[in-house]
Amino acid sequence: MLARSRVCLQTITRRLADFPEANAIKKKFLFRKDTSTIKQLKGLSSGQKIVLNGWIEQKPKRVGKNLIFGLLRDSNGDIIQLVDNKSLLKGFTLEDVVQAVGILSLKRKLSNEDADEYEVQLEDITVLNASNKKPAQMQDFKLSAIYPPEFRYLQLRNPKYQDFLKKRSSISKEIRNSFNNFDFTEVETPMLFKATPEGAREFLVPTRTKRSDGKPSFYALDQSPQQYKQLLMASGVNKYYQMARCFRDEDLRADRQPEFTQVDMEMAFANSEDVMKIIEKTVSGVWSKFSKKRGLLTLDSKGTLVPAKKENGTVSIFRMTYEQAMTSYGIDKPDLRAPDLKIINLGEFNAFSHLNKKFPVFEVIILRSAFSNMEEYKERWSFLTNNSNYNYRVPIVLPIENDEQANSNWFENFHAIATFENPHLITKFLKLKKGDIVCGCTREPNHSIFENPTPLGRLRQLVLQSEHGKNIYHAVNKDVASWIVDFPLFSPVIIEDKSGKKEKLAYPEYEKDRLCSTHHPFTMVKLKDYEKLEKTPEKCLGRHYDLVVNGVELGGGSTRIHDPRLQDYIFEDILKIDNAYELFGHLLNAFDMGTPPHAGFAIGFDRMCAMICETESIRDVIAFPKSITGADLVVKSPSVIPESILEPYNIKYSNSKK
């Protein structure tokens, strides 16, 4: 221990060199408290003495022998000009932290139409902490507000990111107020849990505890509070919520982080309807208060976009079944800002796929008036046939170049994957025109659609993510919400391709007679399908519900199983979990001691904040996000741990070089 302390002290000595002079340090802590923000100056009169804290926004500029102009930025991101007649700003640099004292004065107007602006006649300025030259060297990054990730703290000083963090805080308060008004109790649950097969990979935490057989013991960081909140229902907590920290060792992308926040809730003596009503009111309230688009839209029974919040104050969000979503939009989280951009099943016209009997449906989606000439088509739509954009097969994409093609032989381009009994009837139905794009592909039959998204569902998603697609097909510049209900309770297990071949599989392949939970194993089956559990569980629908906004899953929930025998049957007989009691005995025991019926939901809080702040990545609304590789580049984590420290945890490096 002494040796380690010595190393640390030596490191500090090398970095800081001499002991700092006392007055220089003390001065940084002796600052005035009677300060204002720049916004508060609007209520003051010219000639008043003021004190401002902030940062030097730009390097001060000498404009005369006894005149220097500087800019001060306060913690709100507001900026005011400093007028220095005493050369007080001499030597100051970008991002110095200062306290400025001066006289408030009106800035000279260039014209009578200009609004009043203030400046400060500087009397004194104190450096509370000087900046090095790094911020000045990164001036170009400051202008774009895109800094290297290791300088995240500089990026967060930008008003845009300050606004994101403040709005996130305000949204959190609003959600808490909403649940408190519904008489929920906020309860914190443990983050150190145990490893269980809930879906995603877990982060494991080693301990110094050994089992009786000598094997090391590990915690798992909680993927979600799912099991703890069900135990709270068993504990007599009637309505629970928390802003929960969750951890999943997943492949990362713009809308994923290894640690994230979810708004978690659960209700005893409740079903799906009870939960959905509260979520509708809470989410709608947040959108109405904080979104620049002022509220959510949804669909009515005719498919027309209407406000989710009615004039009488009630909130009702459209419900779409999983089957409807997959057949009309090819994905279980459809972007309904383009409600009329639908996929068409040509089976009604006796057009079928002949390549794979498990994928017999041939369907198309028509991109109307998508281009004016072939040069524009190639420039704007080439990504639709990019193999890397799809999990499996790529749709056939056909631009309609002229009216003759539209009215006669377009379907010949799809003969490789489909058979047409009456192509002329289909042509009459589709009413193709020059400038349209016909996209066609195959999928599984209705009631058995597990490939999600389908190729055309993915194509539609790509279209609506592109700027040109948004401009053409979005019906509104608003946020559109829908519920997706009646999911399959179980899904076939996809066989992972471990062949090492560069060519992708054209179709997903499933393991025979093996199922996994579509969401998680605690979801209750729809009562009308209960008898199917015994013989044909793959045909059962679950009492699960997802809330989708703009093609993004904002959250999901379900009515839970609270009967121990049914839960055990699903673990053992359907999911084939051999050690179910070892993994889930705590739940089964609680269920066997009078756990009430319960249902719940979880909202992806980071995702919600990103949508309301109108930014593509959740990283923008998280103070210190992880990179695409899962690293925190500010603090340089994760890091290598010396083997001597790992030893008490019963962990050794393999192939370690000593």
Swiss-Prot record:
Protein name, UniProt field = Aspartate--tRNA ligase, mitochondrial
Q: Which CDD domains match?
A: AspRS_core, ScAspRS_mt_like_N
- Gene behind the chain: MSD1
In this chain, L-aspartate is annotated as bound at: 198, 248, 560
The record, for HAMAP family, names: Asp_tRNA_synth_type1
Identify the taxonomic lineage of the organism of origin: Eukaryota, Fungi, Dikarya, Ascomycota, Saccharomycotina
Per UniProt, where does ATP bind?
Answer: 248-250, 553, 604-607
Which residues does the annotated region (Aspartate) include?
226-229
Q: Which SUPFAM superfamilies match?
A: Class II aaRS and biotin synthetases (SSF55681), Nucleic acid-binding proteins (SSF50249)
Q: Please give the start and end residues of each transmembrane region.
A: none
What EC number(s) are associated with this protein in UniProt?
A: 6.1.1.12
Q: What else is known?
A: Present with 1550 molecules/cell in log phase SD medium.
Q: Name one GO molecular function term.
A: nucleic acid binding
Instruction: List, alphabetically, the GO terms of the cellular component aspect.
Output: mitochondrial matrix; mitochondrion
Reaction it catalyzes: tRNA(Asp) + L-aspartate + ATP = L-aspartyl-tRNA(Asp) + AMP + diphosphate
Q: Which UniProt keywords apply?
A: Aminoacyl-tRNA synthetase, ATP-binding, Ligase, Mitochondrion, Nucleotide-binding, Protein biosynthesis
Q: Which organism is it from?
A: Saccharomyces cerevisiae (strain ATCC 204508 / S288c)
What does this protein's UniProt record list under function?
A: Catalyzes the attachment of aspartate to tRNA(Asp) in the mitochondrion.
Q: Which family does it belong to?
A: Belongs to the class-II aminoacyl-tRNA synthetase family. Type 1 subfamily.
Location comes to:
Mitochondrion matrix
Instruction: Give me any GO biological process, just one.
Output: aspartyl-tRNA aminoacylation
